[in-house]
Amino acid sequence: MRVLIVKTSSMGDVLHTLPALTDAQQAIPGIQFDWAVEEGFAQIPSWHSAVDRVIPVAIRRWRKAWFSAPIKAERTAFRRAVCANQYDAVIDAQGLVKSAALVTRLAHGIKHGMDWSTAREPLASLFYNRKHHIAKQQHAVERTRELFAKSLGYDKPQSQGDYAIAKHFLHCQQAVSDPYAVFLHATTRDDKHWPEANWRELIGLVGNTGLRIKLPWGAPHEEARAKRLAEGFDYVDVLPRMSLEEVARVLAGAKFVVSVDTGLSHLTAALDRPNITLYGPTDPGLIGGYGKNQMACCSPEQNLANLDATSVFGKIH
């Protein structure tokens, strides 16, 4: 059985889809998935053993020059890739008009998605042959697991979902002389940031544990912040620029992770690493960390400035 998944973004949403693949793999031996996903997240599906082919899409980049010759050529190549197979099922787990019109519509096979009342954008459901009612008041992982179960005809397991990608990185782990923690300090929204003074206080508290601390970054301003956080602490390493897979290897080897609400926090959960995620304005209930050893640390009045380092350090122990 061959199935096309349409789940293009964001990092957290792509990761939240993985447990559904594990369910399907256990229910339908030999099932294989192709996956249409934004080029920036194309490494993620390849980590799961049920994925045969990753089809990168670049909607975010293409729309900046939609009718230019190079972009037209890329769109044509993408269309050919999506149309290359007759699928037993096409599952649109994105639920957006954009992805339904530009990806799902093109694919050959019976198209499944959420119905008018439960899709993220109701109009997207018009592109589906089979529309499934998936209750909204449940975690995003569970919604996607239910969608796959209904689309492929098996009962959704009652057990916690399994991302099943941690083993991909086990063979990559090398002996590390110094145990370490990872602090994920970078996120896209200003109100999701934890003040630098709080991070530095937490770094100071961790100093007595004998652990090193690693600080990844993805953009120049994040690198500058990491250097400010590390200043004066000889047990803190500002990492070089890394690919997503390289960051995943670092996370997979960590004793624990402390993170703000960011895509890499969801990657930590997918790798089954202990993780304390700091939440301010966002509610972790429906879209927070999902998996083993995931702890939400919510700030008073939904303001991360009110979350003190001592409280966070207490949760480490």
From Swiss-Prot:
Family affiliation: Belongs to the glycosyltransferase 9 family.
Any GO BP annotation: lipopolysaccharide core region biosynthetic process
E.C. number: 2.4.99.23
Annotated disulfide bonds: none
Keyword tRNA-binding applies: no
CDD domains in UniProt: GT9_LPS_heptosyltransferase (cd03789)
Membrane topology: Peripheral membrane protein
Predominant localisation class: membrane
Keywords assigned by UniProt, alphabetized: Cell inner membrane, Cell membrane, Glycosyltransferase, Lipopolysaccharide biosynthesis, Membrane, Transferase
InterPro entries named among the record's database cross-references: Glyco_trans_9, LipoPS_heptosylTferase-I, LPS_LOS_Heptosyltrfase
Positions with a binding annotation for ADP-L-glycero-beta-D-manno-heptose: T187, T188, K192, E222, M242, D261, T262, G263, H266
Record-given protein name: Lipopolysaccharide heptosyltransferase 1
